[in-house]
Amino acid sequence: MPSEPISPKDWLAQQPLQSGERLYLIISAASDADALKTLYLTEPTAQLLPIWGGTPYSTWQPVMPYLTELKANSAFLPWIAETDALDWGWLAVSRSAPNEVFEHLRSLTQVKMPDGTEVFFRFWDGRHIYPILRGLGEKAGEVLPVFERYLINGQALEVGTRVVPKVRDWPWWEVPKGLLEGLMAENPSTVIGNMMQWLQEEHADLYFSFPESNLKQKVARFVKRTPLTEENFTGLLKAYLEKEVVV
């Protein structure tokens, strides 16, 4: 169960930044909470790195995730404590330089599902990344080795330090079946969200064949009744929706 939410101020007070540690903000332009606008107002000199820069998605500004470094007394931190939004981004501490952090985040632009399908990884959305990191346990540091501890939607998570390996080309991370099954048992929203995004990017014709709310219900129904151990999980979803269109 989630613990009582903690504010950035209290989180940093409990474990202050040590020499060589940096506070990073991952923030999304896609959130309806206007987090990016608030950041520009409170930190007008912030240097934001577009995480999809240098990829085929570098022009997707309306949904772009960004990386920036903050001071421990940043004027943006109170907004984080006060907002009710859960999809705007998160904070993390690292000993790596901004460019190295940027490259590791960019290497997670897409990941592989257990059936081999490549999907966008919503790492900037705390609703998705927190249960994944928590579910990975000690292996969480293998996915984002540049970060030592996180504050995601008021929940603190520590993964410890490790040697930061060389950045790999995406999609390099294969989402473990066991992790997805655990997420499904606890809350299927992460898997449903990933499948919705996969449909929008890879099969827009199917995606726009239904009102979004209806499509989400159909995807949820499929996800709940189809074992993730199926080798062709995404193919079965596509076939199921194609049949629904015909009907």
Q: What kind of region is each of these model predictions?
A:
Residues M1-R122, G126-V247:
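Terminal low-complexity "docking" segments
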